[in-house]
Amino acid sequence: MENMRFSLKALRINKGLRQTDLAVELGVSRKTVAAWENGKSYPAADKIDGICKALGVGYDNIKWKA
């Protein structure tokens, strides 16, 4: 069975979070979250675990834009 993968934005919206909510939880700016969602930058390793916890998913369930 293949793992289901969803975009960071879709997961955030599904969780009922605004970019600002996720940013505050992770200690980054809203613009940083927007850049991650748009594939303009990639989260640092120390933020990835927090993203997964905040969204309630594993790393393999997030479709990271390159």
Predicted segments with their positions:
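A short, Lys/Arg-rich alpha-helix, primarily the initiator
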Residues: 1-14
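Residue-level signal for the short linker/turn that defines the boundary of a DNA-recognition helix
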Residues: 6, 17, 43-46
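Residues in the recognition helix of alpha-helical DNA-binding motifs
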Residues: 11, 25, 36, 65
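Alpha-helical residues within the helix-turn-helix
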Residues: 13, 24, 53
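Short alpha-helical DNA-recognition segment
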Residues: 16-35
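Key DNA-contact positions within bacterial/archaeal DNA-binding proteins
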Residues: 31, 41, 60
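DNA major-groove recognition helix of helix-turn-helix/homeodomain DNA-binding modules
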Residues: 44-61
